[in-house]
């Protein structure tokens, strides 16, 4: 979503929220939480407050009037009823064939509520230096996580990675072959953004940064001499990320056309730009997702930018056998999340042995 549109939607949600949610928003903005995260949380709060009103757990006529005492006195049984509502309500819609919200969506909703309750019961201070209330009912609500072994997850992901020679082959395909299948009109659009699109794909494959980190890159954050970029990690921590050398040519080619092609002025700080009616804007996450999906589907299989992150991590582990190095590259504080890549690489090694 374009940044300007995202901020507009955030303001729309803020306009209907209770004062304590606005306090929460301001506090998390200072952490800083990303605007995308805060937008998703505000959507979840609206879903929750709508349910409170529908379930007659508040007498407030509108969301903004729901007071703190309502949240303070909700019981574990109330929250379990909300979870049941999330699981079952879509099936009550006769026009829908869905059986209910996915467990992932439900977990996201509960995570947003847990964050709000933690703020209200632990983090915020009133005039006496105390939190607004002390009873955190969310601590009593358990979440169900999807059960899947690392081996199973590795097998599912492996088919969507561009390992070995496929990394450069994918870039080469976009650079030299993709255009051949296009109509003359489509070729014009492709050529306008070719250098930029290749630079984005190359950066994702060469650094393993998250989509949000790539979107938020500014010109000042990119050092092509050192092949290092500065990003804001989850939790607001600034980090320096090494970029593999194969991306340098693609990034340089994009920079050579960036100003002229996208009408960029001094005030246009974003590294990756799009242009509409002569006005440059930061390229948004949705556009990059669609772009990566389009090219990857034509090359082999449709993937997300996150799979390009997995690709880099797997290739790096295969080359170094160091989970510590991989976790540092990805911006993780623990090596536990990199266990997945050992399984993928071990499977690849087994397949290689079987082919001897």
Swiss-Prot record:
Q: Which GO terms describe its molecular function?
A: DNA binding; tyrosine-based site-specific recombinase activity
- Where in this chain does the record put each Core-binding (CB) domain? 16-121
Give the location in the cell: Cytoplasm
Means of activity regulation: FtsK is required for recombination.
User: By its UniProt entry, which Pfam families does this protein fall under?
Assistant: Phage_int_SAM_1, Phage_integrase
The biological process GO terms on file are: cell division; chromosome segregation; DNA recombination
Record's keyword annotation contains Ligase = no
InterPro entries, per the entry: CB, DNA_brk_join_enz, Integrase-like_cat_sf, Integrase_catalytic, Integrase_recombinase_N, Integrase_SAM-like_N, Recomb_XerS, Tyrosine_recombinase_XerCD
Q: Which domain of life is it from?
A: Bacteria
Q: Provide the Gene Ontology terms for cellular component.
A: cytoplasm
Active-site positions on this chain = 210, 234, 306, 309, 332, 341 (o-(3'-phospho-dna)-tyrosine intermediate)
Report the transmembrane regions from the record. Answer: none
Does the entry feature the keyword Cell cycle, yes or no? yes
Q: Which family does it belong to?
A: Belongs to the 'phage' integrase family. XerS subfamily.
Q: What's its job?
A: Site-specific tyrosine recombinase, which acts by catalyzing the cutting and rejoining of the recombining DNA molecules. Essential to convert dimers of the bacterial chromosome into monomers to permit their segregation at cell division.
Q: Which HAMAP family match?
A: Recomb_XerS
Stated name of the protein: Tyrosine recombinase XerS
Q: Which gene encodes it?
A: xerS
């Amino acid at each position: 979503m374009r940044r300007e549109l995202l901020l507009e939607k955030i303001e729309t949600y803020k306009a209907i929220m209770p004062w304590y949610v606005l306090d929460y928003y301001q506090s998390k903005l200072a952490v800083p939480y990303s605007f995308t995260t805060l937008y998703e949380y505000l959507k979840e709060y609206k879903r929750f407050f709508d349910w409170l009103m529908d379930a007659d757990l508040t007498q407030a006529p509108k969301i903004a009037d729901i007071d703190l005492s309502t949240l303070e006195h909700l019981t574990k049984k109330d929250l379990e009823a909300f979870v049941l509502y999330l699981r079952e309500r879509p099936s009550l819609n006769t026009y829908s064939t869905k059986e209910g919200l996915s467990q992932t969506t439900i977990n996201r909703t509960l995570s947003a509520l847990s964050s709000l309750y933690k703020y209200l019961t632990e983090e915020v201070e009133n005039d006496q230096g105390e939190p607004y209330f002390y009873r955190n009912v969310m601590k009593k609500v358990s979440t169900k996580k999807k059960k899947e072994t690392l081996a199973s997850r590795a097998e599912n992901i492996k088919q969507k990675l561009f390992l070995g020679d496929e990394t450069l082959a994918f870039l080469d395909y976009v650079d030299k072959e993709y255009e051949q299948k296009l109509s003359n009109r489509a070729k014009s659009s492709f050529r306008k953004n070719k250098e930029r699109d290749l630079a984005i794909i190359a950066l994702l494959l060469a650094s393993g940064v998250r989509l949000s980190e790539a979107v938020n890159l500014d010109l000042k954050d990119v050092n092509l001499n050192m092949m290092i970029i500065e990003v804001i990690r989850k939790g607001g921590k600034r980090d320096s990320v090494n970029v593999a050398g194969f991306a340098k040519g693609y990034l340089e080619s994009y920079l050579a056309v960036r100003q002229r092609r996208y009408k960029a002025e001094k005030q246009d700080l974003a590294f990756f730009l799009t242009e509409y009616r002569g006005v440059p804007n930061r390229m948004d996450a949705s556009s990059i997702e669609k772009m990566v999906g389009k090219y990857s589907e034509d090359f082999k299989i449709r993937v997300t930018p996150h799979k390009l992150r997995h690709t880099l991590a797997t290739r790096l582990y295969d080359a170094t056998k160091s989970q510590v190095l991989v976790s540092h590259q990805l911006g993780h504080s623990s090596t536990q999340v990199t266990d997945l890549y050992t399984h993928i690489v071990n499977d690849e090694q087994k397949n290689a042995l079987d082919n001897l």
